[in-house]
Amino acid sequence: MSNETRAKIVKAAPNRWLVFCILTLSGGIAFKLSSMKDMFYVPMQQFMGLSNTQIGGALSAYGIVQTIGLIAGIYICDMFSKKYMIGGSLIGLGAVGVYLSTFPGYWGFLAAFGVMAILGEVTYWPVLLKAIRLLGDEKTQGRMFGFLEMGRGIVDVII
């Protein structure tokens, strides 16, 4: 993308700080579901009737799908509209959260973690980074990414 095109995009978004705040908030919330095991491992294990091996298998599936999918995610984020990709990913992650609240069995849990990897790591994360990159020009991109991580950290503390 040329510097002129990027400058037009930056100038065309007078509400870019509002967009930035919404993206930061969504970036802090989007990965909470996949990291629920950090705080609720034992209750999750008891209520869902899962063994350590089964939870480890689901987390391994998440990692494998994430690793392979990130390569595809680089290309996917350029093919479709960012607002539809981010919105669709967040809605999909919410639907997976609702499904997990029904305490599915192992195969449902495994599928949910695979879908979360696709929605969170393949279709959401690269698009979020590209959207943040497009909000700033060459001089402010580093600052925008710093503010993104700061905002995600604040959201993590609050939630």
Identify the role of each PLM range:
Residues V122-D137:
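Intracellular juxtamembrane helix-capping segments at the cytosolic ends
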Residues S35, G63-I71, V157:
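Residue-level signature of mid-helix packing/kink "hotspots" within the transmembrane helices
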Residues W107-T123:
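Hydrophobic core of transmembrane alpha-helices in multi-pass small-molecule transporters
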Residues I91-G105:
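C-terminal ends and interior cores of transmembrane alpha-helices
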Residues L18-M44, M48-N52, I159:
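Extracytoplasmic
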Residues G69-S81:
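Helix-to-loop junctions at the C-terminal end of transmembrane segments
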Residues G142-I159:
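Glycine-rich segments within core transmembrane alpha-helices of 12-TM secondary carriers
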